[in-house]
C-alpha cells in the first residue's frame, strides 16, 4: 500500500499545526493561570536514555541529563505530531483532507492521549495517567 504525496504533505501540515497549537495553548495556560508548561527536554532525556537500554525511570527528573536532550525532545514532539497526523490521514483514507470536519479529528486527538497516559507517563515514573503526580487530574486534563 503506497501513501499518496498529498497525504504525506497534508499530514506534515496537520501534525506541525496541531503541535504548534498545543504549544500555544500550554503557553497560554502558563502565562494566564501559572500552570507549568510541558517540558520537552524530559521527553528528550527519556529518548536519549533508550540507546543505553533504559526505557523506564523511577523519576525522569532525577535521571542524569543527556547532551542535546532539549533539542531531541522538541524534534520528537513535532515528529510525533506528524506521525499521529499521518496515521489519522491513512485511517481516514485521505478523504478527510478533501472535506475536513471537526468531529473525527477531535475524537482521534482525544484518543491519542493513550500514548502519554500508558507509555510516556509510566516510563517517566509518573504512574499510569499521571497517578503519581501531585495533581493527577490537572495532568490528565492537560493531556487532552
Question: What are the language-model segments listed below?
Answer:
Residues 1-144:
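Juxtamembrane/disordered regions of integral membrane proteins
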Amino acid at each position: 500500500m503506497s501513501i499518496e504525496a498529498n497525504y504525506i504533505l497534508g499530514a506534515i501540515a496537520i501534525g506541525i499545526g496541531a503541535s504548534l497549537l498545543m504549544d500555544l495553548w500550554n503557553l497560554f495556560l502558563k502565562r494566564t493561570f501559572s500552570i507549568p508548561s510541558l517540558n520537552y527536554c524530559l521527553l528528550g532525556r527519556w529518548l536519549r536514555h533508550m540507546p543505553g537500554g533504559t526505557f523506564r525511570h523511577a523519576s525522569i527528573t532525577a535521571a542524569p541529563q543527556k547532551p542535546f536532550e532539549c533539542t531531541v525532545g522538541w524534534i520528537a514532539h513535532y515528529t510525533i505530531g506528524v506521525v499521529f497526523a499521518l496515521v489519522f490521514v491513512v485511517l481516514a483514507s485521505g478523504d478527510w483532507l478533501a472535506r475536513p470536519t471537526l468531529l473525527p479529528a477531535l475524537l482521534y486527538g482525544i484518543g491519542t492521549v493513550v500514548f502519554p497516559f500508558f507509555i510516556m507517563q509510566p516510563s517517566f515514573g509518573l504512574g499510569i495517567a499521571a497517578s503519581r503526580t501531585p495533581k493527577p487530574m490537572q495532568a490528565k486534563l492537560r493531556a487532552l
